[in-house]
C-alpha cells in the first residue's frame, strides 16, 4: 500500500499532509505556501487553481468560483443556496437533477467537480513532494455535514482520481493531531470556525482511543459571512458619502470582498486599519476612491450575532455528551476565524477557560487526516477512532411522522433494524422515504432519498412484516435495506441524495478530469517549449551581435535562417514544431560557440604573458621588503 495523503478540503483554503516517518507533515505547494486558496477560475480557455485563480479574481469575477463547499450536496431550492446567490458574483444555476451547480465560461459545473479541481491540485502537490503517484486519500468534512454532502465530497475525490479511503470529520481530525502521541487522558472540546462552516465536537481521549461523545454545528456559518458583513458595511458607507451603490458592480464587489477579508485579518492583531481602494468606480464628475478607517470595535459590533450563533451548538453538544462546561479540560481552536480576539473571548467565556492555542488552526485538520491515513495503511498503530453520526436518521411513517431508527451522536459504524407494516389492506408495495434531521415531522427534515419494496403478498393492513435496516459506515454514509419477512423479498440501496450525481455522471466527470489533466500537461509542455525557444532566440541574437563577424558568411547565414525560422513559430501552438526549430537553431548556433572559443584562445597567450610579468614584479617587490 502506497502513501495515503490527508486533505483538508476547506471553504476558503485547502491543505494536504502526509505521514513522514512517525510524524505528520504539511506539504508546501508549488508556490511555497502551506495552504492553497480553494478557488477555481476559467480564463481564456484555461483553468486556474489556487493562488493564480485568486490573483485574477478582480478582473474576472463571473468566472471565478470560490466557497463552493457551501453548495456541495445542496438542492437549488435550499434557502442557504438562495442566500449565497445574493452574495457571490458568479452564477448559481439549477441542474437537471435539482441540485445547485455553478456556471462559468459558458459551462455548468457541479460543486463536486469544482471541488475535484482543488483536490487534483492537492494530489499534484503531494506527488511532486513524494516523487511518486498518489491514489489514496483521507478527506475531511465538517462534522455537521449530512449524508448528501458527504457523498458529494466522496464523489469529488473519485472525479479527482483518488480512492477516498475515509471521510473524517474536521474536529475529529484536529483532535487526532492534538492528541497524537500524548498519553494523558482528557475530555476536550474542538471549536472549529472555518471559512464557511462551524462545528463543535466533544471528545474523550485516553490511551490512543479518540471517542467522539457528541457533535453539533452549522454548515452555513463561517468567515465568508464575516466578510459579507464587512463588505455590506463598506457599500453602505460609500453609498452614504457618494450616492453610488457598489453592490451592482461585479468588479467593485470583488475588490471590496478582497479588502474586507484583508481588513478582517489585520484587525486580529491591530485595533484599526485603513481600507483604501482607488478608482473603485466613476460618475460624471470623475473617478471615485474609497478611503475608510475601520476599527476592531466596529468589526466586533458588525459580527457580534454571528459569534453568538456559535454558542448554542456548543451548549447542545455539551448537553448531548452529558457534560458541563467545567468538565472540559481543554478547548482546541480550529479554523482561521478563531484568530479573531472576539471569538477567543466568546469561547473563553462559555467554557470558563483559556482556549488552547498550541496548534496551527489552518493546518491541524490536514495533519489529523494524514494520521488517519497512516492508521489505514498501518503506518500508525495504537490509535482507535470512534466517531459519531451528527444527525438522527429515520423514515417517514403514517401521517408524515419522522420515525427515528438511529439517534444523533450514535457511534459509527452502526446498524439498526426495526419492523414496520402496511397502512392499507392488500398493499403490494411500500415506498421507503429516508430522512435525516431532528424535527418530528418528516417534511421538516432533509430527504436523503427513497426506494420501493414491491411484491409484498396481499394481506390485511398491519399484518405484513417489513424489516427496515439502517447501516452507517465509517464515512458516515448511509446504506438502507427493506425486507418483507414473509416473501423474503429485499431491496438494498446506498442512499443517494434526491439530486446527487449518478454513477454515469461521475464516470463522465472522471473522464473529463483525466482529459483536462492531459490538456494541462500539453499546455505546460507548450509553455516550457516556448520559454526555452524564447531564451535561445535572445542568447543567439546577443552572441550573433558580438561574434557574428568571426563567422564565415555561410555559417552566419545558416544561423540567421534558423533564428528567423524559430521566431516565426514562437507564437504557434505546435509544441513539436517549436521544439524542432529550437533544435535546428541549437545545432546552427554551435558555429557561434566555435567562433567564441577561437576568439578566447587567441587572447590567451597575451593573458599568460601579463600573468608572468605580474609574478616577476611581485617577486622583486618581496625581495626589496626582505632587504
Curated annotation (Swiss-Prot):
Bias kind Basic and acidic residues: ranges: 611-627
Region (Disordered), start-end ranges: 593-627
PTM sites of type Phosphothreonine: 197
Induction, per UniProt: By stress conditions e.g. heat shock.
GO MF term set: ATP binding; ATP-dependent protein folding chaperone; unfolded protein binding
One family name in Pfam for this protein: HSP70
Alphabetical UniProt keywords: ATP-binding, Chaperone, Nucleotide-binding, Phosphoprotein, Stress response
Domain of life: Bacteria
InterPro entries linked: ATPase_NBD, Chaperone_DnaK, Heat_shock_70_CS, HSP70_C_sf, HSP70_peptide-bd_sf, Hsp_70_fam
NCBIfam families the record matches: PRK00290.1, PRK05183.1, prok_dnaK
Function: Acts as a chaperone.
Family listed: Belongs to the heat shock protein 70 family.
HAMAP family per record: DnaK
Family matches, as PANTHER family: HEAT SHOCK PROTEIN 70KDA
Name assigned to this protein: Chaperone protein DnaK
